[in-house]
């Protein structure tokens, strides 16, 4: 088939790459790197590198795993139809309407509205916020273009103003020694706990749909535009995160680890740019949250539309998600996180397992995938119930306790497959 938009390939990569950057760059990603800079002090570059690999490195692995097998559904399909549907639905709900989408509104209200505008009701704000999300998401084919071509450039301008000012006129000297005991471990742990790799699966749904709508229909064409966009998004995230981490390092003699992450960022911005800086920061937080909310709402609606075989239209799911998220956002940010954190802790490890298997050994048999995922989810459930023995597992302190059980169960499943398949074959031959 002829590539319909071939003359615009570079433009499409830029627009889709900008959109992918903005979807990953939520408000939480604004506050993590500066705090890491305070923790690391003179070792901020090493801490940042560990953070970036564990955060965006994992997310990019998820994007390329998705590209390798063709779709988000194909990544989890090797688990079996029902387990795959349960895992993806739990994942979409947790990083969608149950947690991350309402959190975007709650974060915008607490970090952008309250410091700059007094007397605004959180209920009124949430209605306005999700009315905007509804308006921007209702046309599925336009979502990526709206985010990539309109909102992301504004977000990047706001971030550039803050970072360039902080680099040109540092707020202080970097501390001589780190404030944290193990900077690399802290960076890995912080990056892993952002769970951005999970978002890559639902974001992949709308990114691939956008590529198809632009005329990129073959696997090779989709790989070209999405891989190029992912690399661009990764480079932008690298620059922004590094800049924010450096800003934190420049105040490592002024603040200790007792300061809150959001409080630290607001203090840095106000010291750099004064009251005008707080307005700019409010715009940055608002845009970061809006773009992430758009991506999550659209991808969740697209997933559930496909799950029910389009018996319920995309627009209906967008409306339901926006209404539910508006209500949930008024429960308060801390309560939202506390409700869904245990569920996320359980679904994250098996999701990473199938992502890595799809990326590294895509031809692995389904027994291996199911066994490894079973080991990971079993370990996650035991940790959720705080079983003391789990603390003895390797990498427990980093939250990677599930790796050993996943490997062991995957190998056991591989051995089982080697025994079962020849047995079935011999039984079939005997019948002949």
Language model features with spans:
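Selective recognition of specific alpha-helical transmembrane segments in multi-pass small-molecule
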Residues: 57, 61, 154-165, 228-252, ...
């Amino acid at each position: 088939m002829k590539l319909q938009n071939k003359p615009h390939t570079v433009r499409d990569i830029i627009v889709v790459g900008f959109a992918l950057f903005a979807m990953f760059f939520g408000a939480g990603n604004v506050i993590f790197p500066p705090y890491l800079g305070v923790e690391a002090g003179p070792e901020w570059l090493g801490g940042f590198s560990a953070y970036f690999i564990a955060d965006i490195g994992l997310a990019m692995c998820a994007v390329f795993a998705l590209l390798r097998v063709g779709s988000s559904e194909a990544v989890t399909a090797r688990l079996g139809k029902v387990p795959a549907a349960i895992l993806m639905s739990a994942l979409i709900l947790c990083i969608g309407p149950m947690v991350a989408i309402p959190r975007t509104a709650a974060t915008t209200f607490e970090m952008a509205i309250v410091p700059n505008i007094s007397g605004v009701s959180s209920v009124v704000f949430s209605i306005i916020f999700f009315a905007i999300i509804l308006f921007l998401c209702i046309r599925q084919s336009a979502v990526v273009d709206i985010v990539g071509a309109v909102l992301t450039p504004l977000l990047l301008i706001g971030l550039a103003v803050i970072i360039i000012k902080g680099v040109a006129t540092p707020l202080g000297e970097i501390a001589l020694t780190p404030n944290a005991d193990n900077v690399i471990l802290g960076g890995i742990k912080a990056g892993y706990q952002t769970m951005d790799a999970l978002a890559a699966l639902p974001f992949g749904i709308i990114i691939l749909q956008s590529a198809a709508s632009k005329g990129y229909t073959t696997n090779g064409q989709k790989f070209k535009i999405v891989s190029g966009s992912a690399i661009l998004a990764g480079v932008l995230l690298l620059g922004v995160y590094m800049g924010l981490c450096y800003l934190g390092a420049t105040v490592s003699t002024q603040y200790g680890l007792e300061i809150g992450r959001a409080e630290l960022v607001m203090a840095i911005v106000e010291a750099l740019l004064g009251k005008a800086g707080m307005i700019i920061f409010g715009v940055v937080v608002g845009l970061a949250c809006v773009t992430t909310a758009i991506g999550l709402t659209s991808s969740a609606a697209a997933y559930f539309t496909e799950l029910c075989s389009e018996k319920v239209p995309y627009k209906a799911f967008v409306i339901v998600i926006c209404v539910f998220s508006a209500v949930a956002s008024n429960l308060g940010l801390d309560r939202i996180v506390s409700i869904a954190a245990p569920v996320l802790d359980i679904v994250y490890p098996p999701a990473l397992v199938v992502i890595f298997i799809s990326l590294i050994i895509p031809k692995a048999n389904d027994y291996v995938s199911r066994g490894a995922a079973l080991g990971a989810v079993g370990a996650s459930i035991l940790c959720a119930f705080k079983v003391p023995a789990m603390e003895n597992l390797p990498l427990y302190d980093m939250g990677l306790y599930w790796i050993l059980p996943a490997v062991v169960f995957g190998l056991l499943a591989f051995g089982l497959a080697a025994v079962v398949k020849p047995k079935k074959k011999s039984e079939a031959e005997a019948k002949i």
